[in-house]
């Protein structure tokens, strides 16, 4: 959280990229750092124009009547935000790869805006598809390569921290970590059950378990 806060508090506006596999707490971390004057938008897989309508509605909470206009493309909505900005704030686009899937031109649009160095607000671009986020920002042929001021990759929590936080003996920590790894959301589900065996059955092995289809979803993220 401290690194993200520092990046957003710099003298000039920043482009911050955050990525990592699902359920690591990226969205929670970002929301914890953002203030009431910042804007958080969670994208979905609907087409680009619909996404802009949804984003405009969220932005209208900060900029009154922002959603009264129609924005025909991504450049127009980003420039409209810039025009309305009189005090720096942060705009977070979560699940950014979903936007790019529907609007392949979006990285080039952002490249243009960033290169102009006229943006008056911070941009945080977050995503769970590690392959896609890597390709968008760390591939030397990508439009946004070298444009990010900070690139943060969230990794699973390491075993020693889990053991200490939950006050587990060494053997129990290894057994539990072998199942749940260092993923905070998995540990939340584990805490709802009295024993490891019960949690394993209820959450993973049962066809009705919350995590029963989790492996498939994780592979789909990296297609």
Model-derived regions, located:
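Phosphate-binding site recognition
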Residues: 1-223
């Amino acid at each position: 959280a401290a690194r993200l806060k520092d990046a957003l508090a710099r003298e000039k506006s920043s482009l911050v990229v955050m990525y990592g596999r699902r359920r690591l707490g990226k969205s929670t971390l970002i929301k914890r750092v953002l203030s009431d004057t910042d804007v958080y938008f969670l994208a979905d897989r609907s087409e680009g124009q619909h996404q802009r309508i949804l984003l405009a509605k969220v932005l209208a909470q900060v900029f009154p009547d922002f959603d009264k206009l129609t924005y025909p493309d991504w450049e127009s909505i980003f420039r409209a935000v810039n025009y309305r900005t009189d005090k720096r704030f942060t705009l977070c686009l979560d699940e950014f790869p979903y936007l790019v899937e529907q609007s392949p031109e979006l990285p080039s649009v952002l490249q243009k805006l960033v290169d102009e160095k006229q943006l008056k607000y911070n941009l945080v671009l977050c995503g769970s598809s590690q392959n896609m986020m890597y390709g968008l920002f760390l591939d030397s042929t990508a439009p946004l390569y070298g444009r990010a001021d900070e690139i943060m990759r969230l990794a699973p929590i390491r075993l020693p921290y889990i053991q200490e936080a939950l006050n587990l003996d060494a053997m129990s920590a290894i057994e539990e970590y072998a199942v749940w790894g260092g993923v905070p959301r998995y540990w939340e589900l584990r805490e709802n059950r009295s024993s490891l065996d019960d949690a394993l059955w209820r959450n993973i092995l049962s066809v009705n378990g919350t995590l029963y289809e989790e492996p498939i979803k994780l592979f789909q993220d990296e297609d």
